[in-house]
């Protein structure tokens, strides 16, 4: 039996939960080994690894008992990426990165590209530069003893962001390139399995809220899947596509069979998601060899769950891994570079040495002159303020004065006329001035006391009380608006329960309240 599993892992370096929840958070490499063992598959295809080649470490890339193959995003770090881990008893005979062949090395590649004349070289490079496809080709033996070729296409198809129409075009062009390559492999005599995150819920049964989605059947991605797949799985139908959705072949009417849930809304708790992950096999392969196709929703650690299939064939491992295998990368191959490669003789002409010496002498003289000027203009210690008293706590909460303070070196002219007018002369004037001065001090002390009281009340008051939602009378959660617009950055309260249909009383109610600025 050959068992294949696909999983959008949502970051291979993140501290995974679920399968690897017993590992410390800084041992992601050990967690990957545990995940592969727990999935118990001969071939494991991972999507959205979110790792670039320079960030790939040896413990992540080389796992005992497996040979691995990675495709990286060449434009962005921490984005996209796919990886395939094969047990040593399922070592492929060939491996290749990308669908177009532009990244092929002509040594150990899969080949069979089909007619790609409708694409420009720039378009092909853009489609393959995000690290979304990885091909491994294996030798398999059927129960009749016949040896055949099986090609696995591990894909992470693009997401069509509604706010970026160009990404829908990119997604559909990627679909087209994937179909051309898969059909070319079929025409060359190889069996083909397309598995991974296709980022499209094919039919209404594959989406929890399909009835409320406008023009669900008219979506370009769903129309593409209609042309690729045979209707009604293994049964006869009006349209016979080259591939079969293996899960719907075995479970044609299973509802609630989802593989992806929104982590923001907590929709996984109530199983309100969509089926975006598939194992698609060519018709002959699925009908003759597929024994089961399954989902693993109990496996946590990502916003997706693993999917897989079991084939009644045995793998014929290659004697040597293809060159794309990560153990052959220079950084992991264990070959030591000679130190002479880092030492380059530096030759200079006499004229260059003489000009450099003159430049250095001039620089030294100029530096000495600058140091002398700095010493002559440096202020004496007595001129610098030496006040180091402890600051009042309120000074950190008061706005700094906008007008600059006067320099201590500037002497203001004395005003004898004003001082003569303001100085009390008679005993009555002195008494009045004394009373006024006392009242001013009392008022100032009172204002300062009130200011301190209001300040400490605001500090010690604590956060505002969390409101209760109207539907369940439960404490709400605070969210922040991240959509560009006039309310960007504003905070609001909403029901803390997971998202679901309005008819479900255990799902989120429609409570909404803007948060008051503190």
From Swiss-Prot:
3'-5' exonuclease activity is activated by sodium and manganese. 3'-5' exonuclease and 3'-phosphodiesterase activities are stimulated in presence of PCNA. GO terms for cellular component: fibrillar center; intracellular membrane-bounded organelle; mitochondrion; nucleoplasm; nucleus. It catalyses: Exonucleolytic cleavage in the 3'- to 5'-direction to yield nucleoside 5'-phosphates. The keyword Aminoacyl-tRNA synthetase does not apply. A zinc finger (GRF-type) spans 469-518. Zn(2+) binds at residues 469, 472, 495, 509. The keyword DNA repair applies. Its EC number is 3.1.11.2. Keywords: Cell cycle, Cytoplasm, DNA damage, DNA recombination, DNA repair, DNA-binding, Endonuclease, Exonuclease, Hydrolase, Isopeptide bond, Magnesium, Metal-binding, Mitochondrion, Nuclease, Nucleus, Ubl conjugation, Zinc, Zinc-finger. Ubiquitinated by the CUL9-RBX1 complex. Ubiquitinated by MKRN3 at Lys-371 leading to proteasomal degradation. Functions as a weak apurinic/apyrimidinic (AP) endodeoxyribonuclease in the DNA base excision repair (BER) pathway of DNA lesions induced by oxidative and alkylating agents. Initiates repair of AP sites in DNA by catalyzing hydrolytic incision of the phosphodiester backbone immediately adjacent to the damage, generating a single-strand break with 5'-deoxyribose phosphate and 3'-hydroxyl ends. Also displays double-stranded DNA 3'-5' exonuclease, 3'-phosphodiesterase activities. This is DNA-(apurinic or apyrimidinic site) endonuclease 2. It comes from Homo sapiens (Human).
């Amino acid at each position: 039996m050959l068992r294949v599993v696909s999983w959008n892992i949502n970051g291979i370096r993140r501290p995974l939960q679920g399968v690897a929840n017993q590992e410390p958070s800084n041992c992601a490499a050990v967690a990957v080994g545990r995940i592969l063992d727990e999935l118990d598959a001969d071939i494991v295809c991972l999507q959205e690894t979110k790792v670039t080649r320079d960030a790939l470490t040896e413990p992540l890339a080389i796992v005992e008992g497996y040979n691995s193959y990675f495709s990286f995003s060449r434009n962005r770090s921490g984005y996209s990426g796919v990886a395939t881990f094969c047990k040593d008893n399922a070592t492929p005979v060939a491996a290749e990165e990308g669908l177009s062949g532009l990244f092929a090395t002509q040594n150990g590649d899969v080949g069979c590209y089909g007619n790609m004349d409708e694409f420009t070289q720039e378009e092909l490079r853009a489609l393959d530069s995000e690290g979304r496809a990885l091909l491994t080709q294996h030798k398999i033996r059927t129960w009749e003893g016949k040896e055949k070729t099986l090609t696995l296409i591990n894909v992470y198809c693009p997401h069509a962001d509604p706010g970026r129409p160009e990404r829908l075009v990119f997604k559909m062009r990627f679909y087209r390139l994937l179909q051309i390559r898969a059909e070319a492999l079929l025409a060359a005599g190889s069996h083909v399995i397309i598995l991974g995150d296709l980022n499209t819920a094919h039919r209404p049964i594959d989406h929890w809220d399909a009835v409320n989605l406008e023009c669900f059947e008219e979506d370009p991605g769903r129309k593409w899947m209609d042309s690729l797949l045979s209707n009604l799985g293994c049964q006869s139908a009006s349209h016979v596509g080259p591939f079969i959705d293996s899960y719907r072949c075995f479970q044609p009417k299973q509802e609630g069979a989802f593989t992806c849930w929104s982590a923001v809304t907590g929709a996984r708790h109530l199983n309100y998601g969509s089926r975006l992950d598939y194992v698609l096999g060519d018709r002959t392969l699925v009908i003759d060899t597929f024994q089961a196709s399954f989902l693993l929703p109990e496996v946590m650690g990502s916003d997706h769950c693993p999917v897989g299939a079991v084939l009644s064939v045995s793998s014929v491992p290659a004697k040597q891994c293809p060159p794309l295998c990560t153990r052959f990368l220079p950084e992991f191959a264990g070959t030591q570079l000679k130190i002479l490669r880092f030492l380059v003789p530096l030759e200079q002409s006499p004229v260059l040495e003489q000009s450099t010496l003159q430049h250095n002498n001039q620089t030294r003289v100029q530096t000495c002159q600058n140091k002398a000027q700095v010493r002559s203009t440096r202020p004496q210690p007595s001129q610098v303020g030496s006040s180091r008293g402890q600051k009042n706590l309120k000074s950190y909460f008061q706005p700094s004065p906008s007008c600059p303070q006067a320099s201590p070196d500037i002497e203001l002219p004395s005003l004898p006329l004003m001082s003569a007018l303001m100085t009390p002369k008679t005993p009555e004037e002195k008494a009045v001035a004394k009373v006024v001065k006392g009242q001013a001090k009392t008022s100032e002390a009172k204002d300062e006391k009130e200011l301190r009281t209001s300040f400490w009340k605001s500090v010690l008051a604590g956060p505002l009380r969390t409101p209760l939602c109207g539907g369940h009378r439960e404490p709400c959660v605070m969210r922040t608006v991240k959509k560009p617009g006039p309310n960007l950055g504003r905070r609001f309260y909403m029901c803390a329960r997971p998202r679901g249909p309005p008819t479900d009383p255990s799902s989120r109610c429609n409570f909404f309240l803007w948060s008051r600025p503190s």
